[in-house]
Amino acid sequence: MTYNFDEIIDRRGTDCLKYDFAKRRGKPADVLPLWVADMDFKTSSYVEDALIERAEQGIFGYSDTQKVYFNAVAGWMERHHHWKIKEDWLIKTPGVVFALALEVTAFTKVGDSILVQQPVYSPFSEVTRDNDRVIVSNDLILGDDNQYHIDMADFEQQIVEHEVKLLHLCNPTNTSGNVF
């Protein structure tokens, strides 16, 4: 299947959070909505077909994740990383921010230092701060190749100097899309 990534779909005025939120807040029309991970490409026909098939059942109750979900994740990890994972390693959460909060409270204590690599999705810092942990920054470096890279010397220094207990690793990085 081919995709048309050149098709421009104007979503303004459709209650689209990405664009209409700024307008409702009195921001300029040309403000770039870099604060939300929302694509402007048309959804794949495979996704549309799956949604239509589910909607045609006429029931919109709560669903449970089936074995097929684990098999898809495990297969991807093995194909791309040659890593066999176990099913009990996967934890279902209602979203990334909730998962970050679980991670912080499960693996650190109040006052512990957590390493955050900027630029990154703002809840990585917000969840850390809101749970009374200390944010230690290891800022990513924009290289000559116009890609962000980890400053490994600073990374090591920050871990030792601040006795970092946890690294919030966003991979791929949201906002740059880099994969480490």
Regions picked out by a protein language model, each given a short descriptive name:
Residues 82-83, 104-108:
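Glycine-rich helix-loop-beta junction characteristic of Rossmann-like nucleotide cofactor-binding loops
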Residues 106-128:
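Conserved PLP-anchoring active-site segment centered on the Schiff-base-forming lysine
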Residues 142-180:
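Active-site phosphate-binding strand-loop segment of PLP-dependent enzymes
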Residues 130-136:
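A short helix-loop-beta submotif of the ANL/AMP-binding
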Residues 100, 124, 176-177:
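Glycine/Thr-rich phosphate-binding loops of Rossmann-like dinucleotide-binding domains
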Residues 2-95:
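N-terminal small-domain helix-loop-helix segment of the aminotransferase-like
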Residues 118, 137-142:
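Short beta->alpha connector loops at strand-helix junctions that form conserved
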